[in-house]
Design a protein with these regions (language model features):
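Serine-esterase "nucleophile elbow" of acetyl-processing enzymes
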Residues: 1-78, 88-89, 257
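Alpha-helical cap/lid subdomain in secreted, periplasmic
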Residues: 84-271
Length: 271
C-alpha cells in the first residue's frame, strides 16, 4: 500500500484545471445544486485528482493500492499531524510519500494564538512574501481582536517584514519535523520518500537528516523539476492561482513524469 501526505502538489490540484472547474464552480448547474450535490461533485473531482497525481500514477505503475491524504493549502505542521494520526494504518513494507510545502504556512509561536483560528498564514510561499509590504489577515480576525489591535498589528507587520523576518526560524522547525518523521518511519518499518513541493525545507544538510531517502535534497523541488523541461503541457494552465508568483501545479503529464522519476529513485534506494 502507498500512503501520501502533502499539499496541493501531492493532492493533484491542477492536473486538468479546465475539467476540474467544469465540474465545480464552472458547472452550468452549480448555482442551483444542493449542498449534497456539490459535495458529490467535489468528491468526484478529488478522486480524479488523486487518480492522476504522482501517487496514483506511481501506484498503478507498480500495481498496488494507494491512499492520497494530500490537502490543498495545508502547512508542514498539518502534514506532520496527519501522518502521526494516520500512522496506525501503516503496515511494515508500505510506501509513504511526504511532499513538504512552504514553511511560511506554519503557525508562528510569537504571534497571538487566535490568528490561527482564521487560517492565518505568513504567506503561501517565499516568492509571494517577498512582494508583501505588510501581512495579510482575514476579516474574520475582527471576531477575536478589536480594530485598534489589528491596526497595531498591520503596522507592526511592516516592521516585521523588513527587520525581523528570518528564514533561520523555519530551518530549526523544519529540521525537527524532518527528523521526527524519519525516525517514526524507521520505527514503523515503512519505505518512505520525502520531497519538496516548491520551497526547500532547509538550506543545508543537518547532522541527523538522512538524505538517502529525500529526493534531490536541497537541489530540486517538484516545481523546479517539472519546469526544467520547458514544456507548458507539463504544468497547469495559467490564470488559476491567486498570486502570480505562486508556482504552477503539474498537469497529468507533469505528474506522470514525476511518478516515473520517483519510481527510478525508489528502486535506487530500496532495491
Amino acid at each position: 500500500m502507498i500512503h501520501s501526505f502533502g499539499d496541493s502538489f501531492t493532492a493533484g490540484l491542477g492536473v486538468d484545471r479546465e475539467y476540474e472547474n467544469s465540474q465545480l464552480g464552472g458547472h452550468p448547474d452549480w448555482d442551483v445544486m444542493t449542498d449534497d450535490e456539490k459535495n458529490t461533485q467535489r468528491s468526484k473531482v478529488e478522486r480524479f485528482r488523486n487518480k492522476n497525481s504522482y501517487t496514483g500514477q506511481f501506484a498503478r505503475k507498480i500495481g498496488i493500492g494507494c491512499s492520497n491524504k494530500g490537502l490543498s493549502g495545508c502547512s508542514n505542521v498539518d502534514i506532520l499531524n496527519s501522518i502521526f494520526e494516520y500512522g496506525d494504518n501503516f503496515k511494515q513494507g508500505d510506501i509513504v510519500f511526504v511532499g513538504f510545502t512552504s514553511s511560511l504556512r506554519n503557525p508562528i509561536s510569537f504571534f497571538p494564538r487566535k490568528f490561527y483560528k482564521t487560517d492565518f498564514k505568513l504567506a503561501p510561499n517565499l516568492r509571494v512574501l517577498k512582494d508583501f509590504t505588510e501581512l495579510k489577515v482575514n476579516e474574520k480576525i475582527l471576531e477575536y481582536y478589536s480594530e485598534e489591535s489589528m491596526s497595531f498589528f498591520l503596522e507592526y507587520s511592516k516592521f516585521y517584514l523588513t527587520e525581523m523576518f528570518d528564514e533561520q526560524y523555519y530551518e530549526i522547525v523544519n529540521y525537527n519535523i524532518i527528523v521526527f518523521l524519519q525516525k517514526y518511519f524507521e520505527y514503523k518499518k515503512v519505505n518512505y520518500i520525502m520531497l519538496d513541493a516548491f520551497d526547500y525545507m532547509v538550506n543545508k544538510n543537518y547532522e541527523h537528516i538522512d538524505t538517502k531517502y529525500y529526493w534531490n535534497f536541497n537541489k530540486k523541488t517538484i516545481y523546479s523539476y517539472i519546469a526544467s523541461f520547458n514544456d507548458e503541457d507539463l504544468l497547469e494552465v495559467e490564470g488559476y492561482n491567486l498570486h502570480e508568483q505562486t508556482p504552477r501545479h503539474p498537469s497529468i503529464e507533469g505528474h506522470k513524469i514525476l511518478a516515473e522519476e520517483l519510481y527510478k529513485f525508489y528502486n535506487k534506494v530500496y532495491k
